[in-house]
A protein has these predicted regions:
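Active-site environment of divalent metal-dependent phosphoester hydrolases
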Residues: 38-44, 66-70, 105-108, 153-157, ...
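Active-site metal-binding motif and surrounding structural segment of the metallo-beta-lactamase
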Residues: 3-62, 162-179, 192-197
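Metal-dependent catalytic neighborhoods of phosphoester/phosphodiester hydrolases
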Residues: 43-55, 69-81, 184-188, 207-211
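Internal alpha/beta domain cores that form substrate/cofactor-binding pockets in large enzymes
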Residues: 160-162, 169-191, 195-243
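Stable alpha-helical elements in mature extracytoplasmic
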Residues: 9-13, 26, 42-45, 80-87, ...
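Core dinuclear metal-dependent hydrolase active-site scaffold
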Residues: 1-29, 92-168, 228-246
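Hydrophobic/aromatic beta-strand patches that form the interior of the parallel beta-sheet core
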Residues: 34, 61, 99, 115-117, ...
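Extended active-site neighborhood of metal-dependent phosphoesterases/phosphodiesterases
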Residues: 60-117
Length: 246
């Protein structure tokens, strides 16, 4: 994922897609988009991308959001309901089908086999933040496996439950930008990745998370901001990591 800085990052995303993914007519078709959870740094600006006349989205995976299920801190400080409403409205304006419950659902993207975890809205006794509800995506191709962990955290035992279902992988997109309350020992031991990708600067990664990554995986670590973007190329015999792609 590119390191997108501040206001105007929607334009950076659109420009990147149009530069790298457009067909001979200058148009981009996305088989699907995934809204991992209703936080502005994950789905904010999605409405601008969806509304772009040169970009077509075939379907969207987006769980329902309600302030009724969200803790007071997030309701007062963040704009979860706003960014969710903007994304959903943009999808509806272009008649894009929205899949709201997709726990365990499987699909494909080119040669990739994709499985979704945490794909249904959780009903917890206590109100929680959106990170607890973050969608996790497993990708498989050429015998290689990668997990995109969104912002999943360890509340309610989510990391332990999901990683037990997934098992070992080759690459992990580290959850929650490497901040605290993610990447438990159980999660890392179950997944045992050889490559860790963190969408952040190295200096911003929480010390406890970096310690656990080194202790329990010993993997190569790539921080997207320091690398000016990271691309993982899945080949029959290896995963080739490319940097400086922006």
């Amino acid at each position: 994922m590119p390191w997108l800085k501040g206001k105007g990052y929607e334009k950076e995303v659109c420009d990147y897609l149009l530069k790298n993914c457009a067909d001979e007519n200058g148009c981009v078709t996305l088989d699907f988009v995934v809204g991992t959870h209703a936080h502005s740094d994950h789905i904010g600006g999605f409405d601008t991308v969806i509304a772009n006349p040169a970009i077509t989205v075939k379907k969207a995976y987006l769980k329902p959001y309600s302030d009724d299920c969200t803790n007071l801190y997030e309701r007062k400080r963040w704009d979860n309901d706003v960014v969710y409403g903007q994304m959903k409205a943009a999808l509806e304006a272009k008649s894009v089908p929205i899949i709201e419950n997709f726990e365990g659902e499987k699909t494909t993207l080119g040669n990739f086999k994709i499985t979704f975890f945490n794909g249904n809205r959780a009903e917890n006794a206590r109100k929680s933040g959106e990170n607890t509800s973050s969608v996790v995506v497993l990708l498989e191709v050429h015998g290689k496996r990668a997990v995109l962990a969104g912002d999943l955290n360890y509340r309610f035992g989510a990391e332990k439950k999901i990683s037990a279902k997934i098992g070992r992988v080759d690459l992990l997109k580290v959850a929650h930008h490497g901040y605290a309350r993610s990447c438990t020992a159980a999660w890392l031991k179950n997944l045992s990745p050889q490559i860790d990708v963190i969408c952040n600067e190295k200096r911003a990664v929480h010390a406890s998370v970096m310690h656990r990554l080194k202790k329990y995986t010993g993997a190569e670590i790539y921080t997207t901001a320091d690398c000016n973007g990271v691309k993982a190329v899945f080949m029959p015999d290896k995963i080739e990591m490319q940097i400086d792609i922006m």
